[in-house]
Structures are given as C-alpha cells and as structure tokens.
Amino acid sequence: MADIFISYKSERRAAAWHLSQILELNGYTVWYDYGLLSGRGFAKRIEKEIRAAKAVIVLWCPLSRDSDWVNNEALLARRLNKYIPVWIEETELPLEFIRDDTIDLKRWNGSPRSHDL
C-alpha cells in the first residue's frame, strides 16, 4: 500500500505522473490508477488503495470537477480525514468542497525545482 493516493481525471494523467515523481524523489510511495484496467474489481481496488493510503491528493481541474469518480474519491478521502485538494487548472470546486483550503499549483510546470511547487 502506498503513502499517497493521487486522484485525477485521466486526461490529466501527465500532471499526476509529474507529481508522483516529485513525491517519490522525496521518499513517499505513491499510487494512482496508471495501468489499472477498468472493469471487475476496479472500484474495490480504488477504495482499498484510498483506505490504505496515509493521504489522498485530489487534482482539481474542470474535467475532474465534473467527474463522478474523482468526486467520489474526494468524498471518501475527506470522510477518512486524508483529503488534500490541489488546483492544477482554474476551476470552481464542487459545492461539497468550496470551503476547503486548496493548494494552488496552476502555474507549476512539472519541474521539481519550480518555485510554484
């Protein structure tokens, strides 16, 4: 089981990958659904990984805002007190999350040396 679970919309997989690389360079183990095939057991595997993780980073953008999967993962993470919201693009958060403090990485270029990180 990983230290950190990253929730994201599949079209923003590159952002999840870049963040996972930085976290791993800093000694964390990271899990996100790269390579996981949808189908039987998909939802159970996602839930298992969220429950096992110490923290869940949710990458918010317009696409993830409208994703039932991302919203459900975020709700579970929040209920488990593991939720870390991160903006990667300008978007309004879903109503359930608008009061949460959110880390702003909208200007981050993916570099581990970026001042925006």
Which residues fall in each region the model found?
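Conserved N-terminal substructure of TIR/SEFIR domains
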Residues: 1-58, 63, 78-82, 89-91
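Short amphipathic alpha-helical segments
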Residues: 17-20, 69-72, 97-99
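Short low-complexity, flexible loop/linker segments enriched in glycine and/or proline
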Residues: 45-48, 73-74, 100-101
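Glycine-rich, Arg-bearing micro-motifs that act as flexible, cationic patches
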Residues: 66
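A short, gly/pro- and small-residue-rich
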Residues: 69-84
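Conserved beta-strand scaffold positions in the cores of enzyme catalytic domains, especially
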Residues: 83-85, 102-104
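Glycine-rich, charge-decorated loop segments at or immediately adjacent to ligand/cofactor-binding or catalytic sites
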Residues: 91-102
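C-terminal helix of von Willebrand factor
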Residues: 108-117
